Structures are given as structure tokens and as C-alpha cells.
């Protein structure tokens, strides 16, 4: 089954590009930009990736992002991620970036976006990987800061498909950003939001009803509300679940306790994603393997994660049909093996 998982076409919908910064690249960029980092080697830095909760991870995440200064830095970061996508048979990815993480420290919005966008264009042409960009607001910052960021996003509608909401969920409910999301929707942007990771099931309901999201990022605490689970099934609201992330951040103690396969079998439109793969110990294939090891599935169930992701993606129906066919063909070819 491992070989089947490796070759399975995959679609990633929940990936923070800053969270794909490999320690080796971090050291390279620190040297390039003359920045001191408080670790003597990439391996020492890797050893620091032990987290008690979301906040302990975010502290290290923001520290790492500090080495990203130039358009070329953001290009290199994104290109390395795309090479991992190619190795994992990811055919389409929709990446998050956090503008405020960079603008708050004096990096121009366009510097960030142009580097990411240029790499994604090369990824389409050289690797055959299609992509979309989603700009996320940091929920621990103010509504005013998010509104300012939205104005920058709106200048780049040709590159940015939608907006999201991430960072620490505790104490920052969806309602805080209602007006920002209303303005984004009025401008024609699609919307997604992190909810129900560390926060309660009510945050999922609020993200759907208040922010009118097309997808819920994480959403695993939906099981605390039976009516909500029923609604997710009925409306086919996608959840972009990140299994290894959930273990690393102690949302679940171990993969055997994770509810993603239970939700899949109930009919919830769950997808598998890597979130911040460098910090959480795995890219897409690693996440699929970890889930299947703890909850053995048949090939059709594994493929359903990709089919759900295709349906939930922000691409046109023609490309969705092509990708569905690709997955169905792959399963058919391997059904007797």
C-alpha cells in the first residue's frame, strides 16, 4: 500500500509556505542576508521542533521567517516546496502566505508576493504543478491591520484567489474579522479560515455562517457538535485536515486517536494536507502514510482524499475533471495489484 500512496496523485489545500522553510535553506538565507540565528547547525535547529501547543510552534515559526528578506528568498522558499510536491506526486497546490509576518518587519508586500508567484509560474511550466495563492490574515493582530493587508491583496487580484485566517485561534474568534471578510467577498475573493483546531466547534459554525468560507481549515473539533457534523456532510463543506500537524501540536495525542478516517467514512469532505511540513515532520506522502498506518484503508478511500481535495479546490471545472480522471485512472490501474 505504501507504493500505491507514493504514486497516488495528490492535491494540497492547506500549506503555509513559510512553514516549508527547511533548516538548510534557513541557514543559507541567514548567511546571504547577514542575519544571526541562535542555532549552530541545521540539525540543532531541527531538534528544537518540539511543541507543546500552537503558540510554542508559532514562536519558532516567526523567528524562522525573519531570514526571508528578498524576492529571491521567497522564490527559493517556494521552489524548494514545489520540488517536494513533485517528489510526492502533488499535481495541484493552493498555498497560504502570511503578508503581515513580513510587512510587520518592513518587507514590502510586493517583494513577498512576486517571489512566490514567480516560483509558482515556473512550477507550472517546468514541473507541471498547477497552483493558487491565498493570503492569510494573522488573527492575533488587529482587525485594522487585516483591513490594511486586504487593501494590498486587492491590488493583486490577478495573482491572489482568496483570503484566509490563521495564527492563534484561542481568544480570536471568527467574528473579530467579520467586516474584513465581508469586504473581501464583495471584492470577489474566495474565503477560507482556520477553525476548530484548538478552538471549539462553535468557531467552525461561525466561520461558515459569519465569514461564509468555501472551506474550513482543520475543523477536526466538529465532532463535538453532532448537528454540525450532519451539516458538514449535507453541504459538502470541505475540511482541510493536517494529521501530522495535529499530533505535533497535541490536538490528538497519537495518530490512532485522530478522527480523519472516521469523518471520511461518515461522508465528511475531509482532505489530507501538510500544514507546515518542515516543523511537523512530513510533506504530503508522509501524512498519507501516517494516517494509513494508524487507520488502514482501502485504495478507494485513500483516493477519496484526493478526489475531495479536487472538488474543494479553487480551479475551473474543466481542470477538476482532468484531475479526477487522472486519479480514477490511477486507482483502476492499481485495483488488482
Swiss-Prot record:
Report the CDD domains cross-referenced here: ADA
Under catalytic activity, the entry for this protein gives: adenine + H2O + H(+) = hypoxanthine + NH4(+)
Q: Look up keyword rRNA-binding and say if it applies.
A: no
Instruction: Identify which residues the record assigns to the active site.
Output: 197
GO cellular component annotations, sorted alphabetically? cytosol
**GO biological process per UniProt:** adenine catabolic process; hypoxanthine salvage; nucleotide metabolic process
Write one Pfam family the protein is assigned to: A_deaminase
Binding annotation for Zn(2+): 14, 16, 194, 275
Q: What class of enzyme is it?
A: hydrolase
**What HAMAP family does the entry give?**
Adenine_deaminase (MF_01962)
The protein's role, per its UniProt record: Catalyzes the hydrolytic deamination of adenine to hypoxanthine. Plays an important role in the purine salvage pathway and in nitrogen catabolism.
Q: Give the protein family.
A: Belongs to the metallo-dependent hydrolases superfamily. Adenosine and AMP deaminases family. Adenine deaminase type 2 subfamily.
For this entry, the protein name equals Adenine deaminase
Q: Which organism is it from?
A: Vibrio parahaemolyticus serotype O3:K6 (strain RIMD 2210633)
Q: Lineage of the source organism?
A: Bacteria, Pseudomonadati, Pseudomonadota, Gammaproteobacteria, Vibrionales
Amino acid at each position: 500500500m505504501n507504493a500505491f500512496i507514493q504514486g497516488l496523485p495528490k492535491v494540497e489545500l492547506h500549506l503555509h509556505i513559510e512553514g516549508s522553510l527547511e533548516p538548510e535553506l534557513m541557514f543559507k538565507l541567514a548567511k546571504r542576508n547577514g542575519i544571526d540565528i541562535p542555532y549552530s547547525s541545521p540539525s540543532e535547529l531541527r531538534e528544537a521542533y518540539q511543541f507543546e501547543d500552537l503558540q510554542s510552534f508559532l514562536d519558532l515559526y516567526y523567528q524562522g521567517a525573519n531570514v526571508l528578506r528578498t524576492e529571491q528568498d521567497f522564490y527559493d522558499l517556494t521552489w524548494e516546496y514545489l520540488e517536494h510536491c513533485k517528489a510526492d506526486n502533488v499535481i495541484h497546490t493552493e498555498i497560504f502566505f502570511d503578508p503581515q509576518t513580513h510587512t510587520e518587519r518592513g518587507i514590502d508586500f510586493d517583494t513577498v508576493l512576486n517571489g512566490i508567484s514567480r516560483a509558482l509560474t515556473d512550477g507550472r511550466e517546468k514541473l507541471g504543478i498547477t497552483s493558487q495563492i491565498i493570503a492569510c490574515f494573522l488573527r492575533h493582530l488587529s482587525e485594522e491591520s487585516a483591513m490594511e493587508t486586504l487593501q494590498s491583496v486587492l491590488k493583486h487580484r490577478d495573482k491572489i484567489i482568496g483570503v484566509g485566517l490563521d495564527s492563534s485561534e484561542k481568544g480570536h474568534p471568527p467574528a473579530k474579522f467579520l467586516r474584513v471578510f465581508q469586504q473581501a467577498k464583495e471584492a470577489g475573493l474566495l474565503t477560507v479560515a482556520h477553525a476548530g483546531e484548538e478552538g471549539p466547534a462553535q468557531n467552525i459554525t461561525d466561520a461558515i455562517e459569519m465569514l461564509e468560507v468555501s472551506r474550513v481549515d482543520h475543523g477536526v473539533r466538529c465532532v463535538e457538535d453532532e448537528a454540525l457534523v450532519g451539516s458538514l456532510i449535507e453541504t459538502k463543506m470541505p475540511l482541510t485536515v493536517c494529521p501530522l500537524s495535529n499530533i505535533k501540536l497535541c490536538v490528538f495525542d497519537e495518530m490512532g486517536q485522530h478522527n480523519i478516517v472516521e469523518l471520511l467514512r461518515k461522508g465528511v469532505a475531509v482532505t489530507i494536507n501538510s500544514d507546515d511540513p518542515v516543523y511537523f515532520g512530513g510533506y504530503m506522502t508522509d501524512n498519507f502514510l501516517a494516517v494509513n498506518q494508524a487507520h488502514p484503508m482501502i485504495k478507494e478511500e485513500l483516493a477519496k482524499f484526493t478526489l475531495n481535495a479536487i472538488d474543494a479546490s479553487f480551479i475551473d471545472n474543466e481542470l477538476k475533471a482532468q484531475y479526477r480522471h487522472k486519479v480514477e485512472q490511477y486507482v483502476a490501474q492499481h485495483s488488482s495489484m
